[in-house]
A protein has these predicted regions:
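The conserved phosphate-sensing helix
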Residues: 130-140, 188-193
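Non-core capping and flanking segments associated with repeat-based/extracellular domains
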Residues: 433-438, 450-463, 469-686
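Surface-exposed helical/coil interface segments that assemble multiprotein signaling complexes
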Residues: 65-67, 115, 144-194, 199-363, ...
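A short helix-loop-helix "switch/interaction" segment in the helical subdomain of ASCE P-loop NTPases
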Residues: 121-133
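Structural position within Leucine-Rich Repeats
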Residues: 260, 303, 327, 344, ...
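A conserved switch/coupling segment of P-loop NTPase cores
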Residues: 28-95
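Post-nucleotide-binding-loop coupling segment downstream of the phosphate-binding loop, primarily
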Residues: 1-34, 214-216
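Alpha-helical sensor/transducer elements of the RecA-like P-loop NTPase core
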Residues: 2-9, 71-122, 140, 158, ...
């Protein structure tokens, strides 16, 4: 910090402080006082480049006095979290292909308007696409290609193929790596490990969030933190790598959370270089340019050509702890007996993996992670019980119909993913460490007793209930009462009885649950016990008919921000629309999606004071029959911003659709916040 403040003083007043960098007597408070004195009556414009920590900014901000003279400060940072803390963020977007070409040509020829020879045009665009619009990458690669030998198509193609897999160690590449490595060396040790691990994926490979995090867990990269599941901790790791710009998000969910990510080619090049230096991970395939080490700890098999076979023949597998095989490289995988200390094995999408190979895998007694997703496995051998250290198991999208009784010996499992048709053995409640169970079919009520014993469950998805005339209500409620750690619940194809929601609370109940999705199930009413779930922020539910009591329950859920209600049958005997007003607090609700054949609600003054998005779907004919008009009270929602509406025009009389549209438009026009209305009509007769 002292060095930064000295540098500021030197640049602001070289006449007085020309030798300040060599003066040892300055303390941080003295430097701050001197800076404030120099700037006291000045109008200044200062750029602080590459801030890594918010505490550094706080000190600098205090030193740069606010004197009311219209001064400006610009800071740059690679850390999105730091940027958000400082405020006033302007996010730079990557250069377009056109501007990338201009920068590229400027570096090659010294003239941005000069064009490349025709034989280099196509390969240059491939190179620029790999640079991803990042100026540093473009300048670095252009510096390599600007050499005399660089003007040949053969050489440019070689550079293009090598990007992301260990580029040649030219001075330009070394300089770029040094710049990028600043971000790497700023990471804490556990994030360095997680980042280097991404070198196992091929270039431009899309990586799903959940898949990556559970691989980290299986590799023991994720540290336990009090009050958090291993998956939550892993999510924080990934979010931090994205925030620091080391991982690029590709796809997002409705909450703007990255569901798929990718490693930029230039970062992958850095990872490959560092990984080779530290003997962290060895990737076989792609454009591998370096000889393989004699000993390997983590192995990624990406392609299976003859050269790769030759390379692997020189490798010892006795120290390999992790193997990931991509489908086209399965022929490279030697016998399982070659990996005596293997802890993680990923054969997902390798269709040639069958039952015989699975039986051999059950001899890998040190395994912590096993993924056989989308393979040709149809049976789980009884020897599966030998894998006493197994924490992560994924056998989803296979033809496995039943798990053996020995499966319940896997008492260290924290993640289990099976196909919808896979039947669990009796006593699976012994898997008491299980935290994530993203797919179970409940075939009979007694299964819910075992499910209720999994008190560490954070994430549960019930794919379906096989009814067979059984009444699941009582055992299901008892099960939910016992799942005290549950945070996310999805229940599909459940037909709740009339008594399912009568209890006002579940004791002790899933008090930590923040998301419940019951949209593909059906209930007579909103269960009363939901109002006792203090952490519940997102709820999707389908009910048969709508009653005042439903909004009394929903309105009392204190943290509810996102609500989706689907009503199957409109209440024909109701004389007027159900008014939502200040009696139903909905203090935090920001998104309300309401689907019903007939629009049964009207918003009164004081309703949903923080609502920003109102998503409606209704049938014009039924709505007109129920209420006689299309007035919904949209002007009474003070913070409303968006009103997407789907209108079913089936069986409408002339003018009714236009009347509905006009009423909706009038409602938003009367709203002081002037929300945006978007109407989509369907079911119109030609």
């Amino acid at each position: 910090m002292v060095k930064i403040l000295k540098n500021l003083l030197y640049q602001l007043n070289k006449g007085k402080h020309g030798n300040i960098m060599n003066e040892a007597f300055w303390s941080e408070p003295q430097l701050i006082i001197e800076l404030r004195e120099i700037l006291r009556d000045k109008r200044y414009f200062i750029v602080i480049d590459d801030i890594w920590d918010y505490s550094v900014w706080e000190t600098i901000r205090y030193a740069l006095i606010e004197n009311g003279n219209g001064s400006k400060i610009i800071t740059t940072t690679r850390n999105a979290h730091v940027a958000n803390q400082i405020g006033g963020v302007y996010s730079l977007i990557p250069l377009s292909l056109i501007h990338s070409r201009k920068l590229f040509h400027q570096r090659i020829y010294g003239d941005e308007d000069k064009s490349l020879p025709s034989h280099l045009a196509e390969v240059s665009d491939i190179i620029l696409n790999k640079c991803g619009g990042i100026p540093l990458a473009i300048i670095t690669i252009a510096g390599i290609l600007a050499s005399k030998k660089g003007m040949t198509h053969e050489y440019w193609s070689k550079v293009s193929r090598s990007m992301g897999t260990g580029l040649e160690d030219s001075p330009q590449i070394q300089k770029m790596r040094r710049i990028l490595s600043l971000s790497y060396y700023d990471l804490p040790p556990h994030l360095k490990t997680c980042l280097l691990y991404l070198g196992l994926f091929p270039e431009d490979h899309d990586i799903t969030r959940e898949y990556l995090i559970w691989k980290w867990v299986g590799e023991a990269f994720v540290r336990k933190e009090h009050g958090k599941s291993l998956y939550e901790v892993g999510e924080n790791y990934l979010d931090e790598l994205i925030s620091k710009g080391m991982v690029k998000p590709v796809e997002f969910d409705g909450c703007s959370k990255a569901t798929t990510c990718r490693v930029h080619d230039m970062v992958l090049d850095l990872i490959t270089s560092l990984s080779n230096d530290e003997h962290f991970l060895t990737a076989v395939g792609g454009q591998q340019l370096m000889p393989l080490p004699s000993k390997v700890r983590r192995l990624s098999l990406q392609t299976g050509n003859a050269e790769d076979v030759r390379l692997l023949s020189t490798v010892s597998f006795t120290h390999v702890r992790s193997v990931t095989v991509f489908d086209q490289a399965l022929n490279l995988l030697p016998g399982i007996s070659c990996f005596p200390v293997l802890r993680a094995l990923d054969l997902s999408d390798c269709e040639q993996v069958d039952n015989h190979r699975f039986k051999g895998i059950c001899k890998l007694f040190h395994l912590r992670y096993l993924c056989l997703r989308r393979t040709s496995v149809t049976e789980v051998p009884k020897q599966i019980g030998n894998l006493q250290f197994l924490q992560v198991l994924d056998i989803s999208l296979t033809e496995v119909k039943v798990l053996p009784s020995t499966f319940v010996q896997l008492t260290q499992l924290v993640y289990l993913n099976v196909s919808a048709w896979t039947r669990l053995p009796d006593g699976f409640g012994k898997l008491e460490c299980l935290q994530n169970f993203p797919g179970i079919t409940v075939s009979y009520p007694s299964m819910l007793h075992d499910l209720g014993r999994l008190t560490e469950l954070r994430n549960l998805k019930i794919i379906k209930f096989i009814q067979c005339g059984e009444n699941y209500d009582e055992p299901f409620l008892e099960c939910l009462s016992n799942l005290v750690s549950l945070e996310k619940l999805e229940v599909n194809y459940y037909l709740g009885g009339p008594d399912f929601g009568l209890s006002s609370s579940l004791s002790p109940g899933p008090q930590r649950v923040y998301s419940i999705d019951m949209l593909r199930s059906t209930f007579y009413a909103v269960p009363r016990w939901m109002s006792s779930l203090s952490c519940l922020s997102a709820l999707e539910i389908t009910i048969r008919t709508l009653a005042v009591q439903d909004f009394e329950v929903l309105g009392k859920i204190p943290s509810l921000t996102d609500l989706y209600v689907w009503v199957l049958e409109p209440t024909g005997e109701r004389p007027e629309r159900l008014a939502i007003d200040s009696r139903y607090p909905f203090r935090c609700l920001s998104v309300f999606r309401f689907w019903s054949y007939g629009m049964e609600v009207v918003f009164s003054r004081g309703a949903m004071p923080n609502l920003q998005t109102l998503d409606l779907d209704f049938q014009v004919r039924k709505t007109k029959d129920l209420g006689g008009n299309f007035y919904f009270g949209l002007e009474n929602l003070p913070l409303l911003q968006r009103v997407p509406v789907k209108i079913d025009c089936y069986c409408t009389e002339p003018g009714e659709v236009e009347a509905a549209e006009a009423a909706l438009q009038k409602g938003v026009d009367m709203n002081p916040n002037k929300p945006m209305l978007n109407i989509l009509k369907y079911g119109e007769m030609g």
